[in-house]
Structures are given as C-alpha cells and as structure tokens.
Amino acid sequence: MADIQSRVDELHRLLNQYSYEYYVKDNPSVPDSEYDKLLHELIDIETQHPEYRTADSPTVRVGGSAQSTFEKVNHDTPMLSLGNAFNEEDLRKFDQRIRDNIGNVEYMCELKIDGLAVSLKYENGRFVQGLTRGDGTTGEDITENLKTIHAIPLKINESRTFEVRGEAYMPRKSFVNLNEAKAANEEQPFANPRNAAAGSLRQLDSKLAAKRKLSVFLYSVNDFTQFNADTQSEALDELDQLGFKTNQERQRVQTIEEVMTYIDKWTKQRENLPYDIDGIVIKVNALEQQETLGFTQKSPRWAIAYKFPAEEVVTELLDIELSIGRTGVVTPTAVLEPVRVAGTTVSRASLHNEDLIHDKDIRIGDSVVIKKAGDIIPEVIKSVLDRRPDDAEIYHMPSHCPSCEHELVRIEGEVALRCINPKCQAQLVEGLIHFVSRQAMNIDGLGTKIIQQLYENEKIKDVADIFYLTKEDLLPLDRMGEKKVDNLLNAIEKAKSNSLEQLLFGLGIRHLGVKASQVIAEKYGTIDELFHVTEEALMDIHDVGHKLAQSVVTYLENEDIRALIDKLKAKNVNMIYKGVKTTELEGHPDFKDKTIVLTGKLYQMTRNEASNWLALQGAKVTNSVTKNTDLVIAGEDAGSKLAKAEKFGTEIWSEEAFVQKQNEIEG
C-alpha cells in the first residue's frame, strides 16, 4: 500500500507540474499524450482504490457528478464593479481627481478580459470554494466547474488562507472548436466567447464544463494580510510565484499620457490576442494609496475601466413596435434586419422616445446605424440619408395604449408618453417581472413567460399572489415538470427571507432605485416604521430628493398598497432590513447589541432566515470574524471562520444550540 501511495503522490506532482507548464506558462515540457497517459493511470488507481482519491486530485479536472442546483453564497466582501471611462476626457478627469486627493501616483494598466468574474477561496493552500460575482453581494457556488479549469491550482505549495479574484474566459480557439461541434450536432452556436464561458460555468454537470476548455486570469487579492505586497504589481508578481495565472501584458506607468499610449497600443492589437478583451483597467498601484482613496457604494475610487469604442454597423429598420414598462412609459423599439454587432446578433434596438425619432428623422424603411451602448444595449444612432428609399415611412406615436386602449399622456417636464391606467395589463405584468428580478426579490425560475401564463390564467394579479402559488397552479404550465415546479416553489419560499431593501425595490415605487432602497431600508429598519414617515424626514436622507420622497410617501399611504403589504405579511414575507440598527429594536438580551457571524451549512433554516431572526433580536450579523465578534454560530463544514473564532477565543454555538435558544425565546 505504501508503494501505491508513493506512486499516487508522484502522479499528483507530475500532473500538476505539466498542467502548470501547459496552461499557465504556455510552455509544455511533455506532449499531450504523456499527460493523458499519466492521468489515466491515476484514474485507474483511484477507481480500484477509492481511498486514494483526494479533493485536490488532478482527476477532478475531468468533472464529477452532476448537481441539482447552484447554492447562493454571500461574498465575504462585495465584488464591486468598476466605474467606466469612454474617452480621453473621462480618463483625464479620473487622473485629476486622483492627484487632487493623493498627489503623485503610479498606475497599473491591465487588459480587461471579456469573461465572467469569479472569486476563488483557498484554505491552508487548498482551493475550497469558487463563486460567481452574481449581484456583487451574493454569488453562486460553481466550485466543481472551476476545478475543471487547469489554470486554477487545486493547491499551492504554501499553507495560506486567502481569496483571489479574476476573470474566467474562453480562449478564441476553444470557442471556435465548441461552435464547430455545435454546428455538427445542429445545435444553436454561442454568440461570443463571453456567453460561452458564462454558459459553461453554469453547467450543472461539471463533466460538460470540463470539455469547454476554459481558462482564467487572476487580477486581485481580497485580503492582503497573507501577502507581502505593497503594490498591485507586487501582488500580481506574488500570485505568479504561487502558481496562479495572471495576465502578463500589464504595465506600470507614471502619467496619464502613458496610460493613453497603453490604450492606443491595445486598441490596435486586441484582435491579435488569443482571447477577447473589452477594455483596459487602470488602477492606482500603491495599496496604501488605494486604502486612502477608498470606495463608493458601487466601485473603488482608485480604479477605472476604459471601454473600447462601440462597434457601429448599418442595417434596415423594418418596423417600429411599442413596449409598455411597469411605470406606464411607452418606449418605441426598432425592429431590424438581423445583423451581428459586438459578437451577438441584433434584431431589435431602442429608439428611446418619440422626440428622438423625429429629431433624428428616423423612418421605417431607412438604413440605420446601430451600436451597443457600453457593448451591451443595442440602440439606433441615426439614419443613412443617402440610402433612404422613396417609400420610407414617417412614424407617428399612437394616442392610446396598445395594451389597454387608455389614452396616453405626456407629463409636464417628461419626454416620454405614459399610460396612466393602474389596471393596464402590460404594466401589471412588467411590475411582476420586476418584482422577481435579480436585484429585487431574486426568484430563480420565475421568468417572463411563466409570469405571463400565470397572469393570463388568473393565478396571479399582484406580487403577493406569487407567495400563494401551489404545485397545482404551476404543473399545467408549458414546460413545467415536477422538478422545475419544486425548484420554483423552493425559490419562492427562500425569497420570503429577503431583506427589506429588496422588497422595497421590488414593489416598483416610482423613482426608487436600488441604492435609495438600501439607504431608506437601513434608516428605518422595518416597513411599519416607513408607514409613518414624512416627506420632510425622507428628504433629510442624503441623495433623497423631493420627487422620490413624495413618491414613497404617496405610495405607502395608498390603502390598496397597505392591503398588499398585509397580504405579503400573511405569508411571512420578511419586512425587516437585514442590518437593522439594534437600537431601534427591543430585541432579546442574549443577542441585543452583539456582533454575530453565521458560518457553515445550516439544515434547520436558511442563512437569511437565521440572519433576519437575529436582527429582530437586536443583533448585528456580519460576514467576517474579528476580535470584536461576540458569537459565531457554526453549521457543518464551517471552515476558516470557525478556525479564526477559536483563535480569538470567540464564543461558538452549534446550529442545535442556536435552535434550542430560539425555541426558549419563542416559547
């Protein structure tokens, strides 16, 4: 048996070495056939002797058993997006702001890889968890799929615990091979490598993900306490030394002129790369200066992403159709002859409003120039006048709503036409779609087509009806089998424990966006407190103006809305902000004013349910264990947070002890 163990160890060493040489250094020392031979030898040993298979065995690269779903996991620290720059003027403003704050600065310029942002967690040198970015606060656990990417080390040679972040992507060669295989099987090809990478990492069967030949570039460290770096460039160098793959085209520069030179170089050379990039990232290099500059709610102040100019193409405008939004705004949409733009086929594009159509003299039948705003949303820029046909048709907006026939109005100071019928079906359906969206209640599986069917079948008339749905309501719907229905009902049940700000945003109160929902929920803590708020009190909150304050108060004073809230409460939908200030709640003395961390897998409730219950007791629930943490509630496989709590001497409870205390309090 000792001979088997030594051979397994040797195979691990050789396979990890060859994988690193091929996928990270791009300099293989042996042919593929040698790697395959050794891998199959290890697979045979593990098949005959399962006790020799480890979590970090090179054989996990080929994928394992299929999962039923991806678990949602909170990030230890948010994965923020970057602010955007679209031209030299934007970059010079960024540079001036930086220098006004911290004086002289060195920048690190890096290629912006066009893929899927991921977070990789290592404990004692072993890769233990990988998450998608998700909404920045909560991502999906795609660990098994990420293990199939050879550029991600399953373990490193040092016993460190840390988190790194980067971009998973599909090399152009892999993309071509994948689409050729899809074409041969008469399957729909992927539009671009980014979509292919995202689709591959969301495969429930990791064996399928393994076949897609993805790669990754790491670009940041989440916590520098385990690193010796003082700068971004030193951090990337240290990641190189640990065996991670970082992009080697990075460059340190001293001036904004050097930044522009770097951008110009890669604007011209981007098509020569073996992977797609969609811009350049500019970061303040010194970590101390990064800390001084800090963050906004959405992004770091010390970094910016320059986006390459959008590709423009010409196609024919076939027709103009109207869509009705959840607030009644009527938006004209161009129906186009399908055309490829920035890697995807576009057949529809926004025309924004009637004034834009007339100001730009855009007519049905014209050849029009379209581009993707921010490389995402297609829009019509202008008509090509010298190609205009004689029968090009001037477009006139209708006087009545195409959904409910109610008269359309233009509110003073607005350019959009609006349907003000509160019973307009199109608005109601759009409101339901908004309620379940990712930044609102985030109900997986409840898409547009299902909502439309449920509305047409009179199973849902308002957002509260969603929480009253049964298996009998869902099974008759198109393409809804037993498993899909169970998953959807579980997602609906899970949404009940969402935080107050998600509910507020989901209700679709006019002028109330994600950020304002967060700020207002944090300020008032519960929906019942908001029922008593005045416009003046709301306007005391930073960034809340008169229009928003008036809209919120008017909405919550409506008796129909109060009845809707009661209907939601009857189904135990949470009405409390997850981080509600303990001073505003009576709470329970065992938890009031205490800082508590939940870690590991809970079986008798979800993390959100536990967090909301603790908030009701006056506790502050956080993600990180520090010396100031009062209590850690540890479920199964608690990991590094439990170890840190033991190190600090923090009080630790099991899930069973926590549930027992809940039962005592609730009688």
From Swiss-Prot:
GO aspect biological process, one term: DNA replication
Organism taxonomic ancestry: Bacteria, Bacillati, Bacillota, Bacilli, Bacillales
A cellular-component GO term for this protein: cytosol
Active site: K112 (n6-amp-lysine intermediate)
GN (gene name): ligA
Classification via PANTHER family: CHROMOSOME TRANSMISSION FIDELITY FACTOR 18, DNA LIGASE
PROSITE patterns, sorted: BRCT, DNA_LIGASE_N1, DNA_LIGASE_N2
Name by which UniProt lists this protein: DNA ligase
Family under the similarity heading: Belongs to the NAD-dependent DNA ligase family. LigA subfamily.
